[in-house]
Design a protein with these regions (language model features):
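Active-site-proximal alpha-helical scaffolds that flank and shape metal-associated catalytic sites
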Residues: 68-133
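Short coil/turn segments at secondary-structure boundaries
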Residues: 19-20, 98-102, 161-165
Length: 201
């Protein structure tokens, strides 16, 4: 999943947020990852990030969404679906969180910037770009989604083709939205189970 879904599933727990944003930057076993300022709750956030991604990759609704894109985008379909689901979430944010999206996203940015010194330098460019560009709120608009896809295409050569995928979000919005509605409650249950397991352990 992409950033907004991930942050939603960390609740309002700053340490989980910080760990989650590290999820794509930490390779190998989480318990062996060391960095000054890293807490056990942040490690849990890294593992939560991995749990979200692993569950998402296998969910039938996500697989259906990928099949819409697969004839054109092949293995890149998953990356595009992740971004499209952030759009669905942002468009219908009030259904999922009591705080308005602009207030929520500014709170996330403040948390990340305030704790930048506790995070590895490799993640700093992502956080700075995300907050300066207001990516999370931008996902609510078609323009913001197109900008996100084009940015990914520029930053990651392997994803060079996805910059043109935005029109399919409009064309198939109702189908992506229905798949998201089926998927998100199941993902929330899995995240709750994971966090309960960590608390018991």
């Amino acid at each position: 999943m992409n950033h907004l879904v991930h942050f939603l599933l960390t609740g309002d727990d700053d340490e989980l947020r910080l760990g989650d944003v590290l999820g794509d930057f930490v390779k190998g076993r989480v318990e062996r990852f060391e960095h000054h300022g890293l807490t056990e709750r942040m490690r849990t956030g890294i593992q939560l990030h991995r749990t979200i991604d692993a569950f998402s990759d296998r969910h039938p609704a996500v697989l259906r969404s990928k099949r819409i894109l697969a004839p054109v985008y092949g293995r890149l379909s998953g990356v595009i679906v992740d971004v499209f689901y952030d759009h669905v979430l942002a468009r219908r944010w009030a259904e999922h969180h009591p705080r308005p999206l602009p207030d929520y996203t500014q709170d996330v940015y403040r948390t990340l910037r305030r704790n930048l010194h506790r995070l590895p330098p490799a993640v700093h460019p992502l956080i700075n770009a995300m907050s300066l560009g207001d990516w999370l709120r931008g996902y609510s608009s078609q323009h913001g989604i197109e900008r996100a896809l084009q940015g990914m295409a520029q930053r990651r050569p392997v994803a060079a083709g996805i910059g043109t995928a935005g029109h399919l979000l409009i064309e198939h919005f109702e189908r992506f939205s229905a798949d998201f509605d089926e998927f998100l409650p199941d993902l929330k249950v899995r995240c709750d189970e994971f966090l309960a397991e960590r608390a018991d352990g």
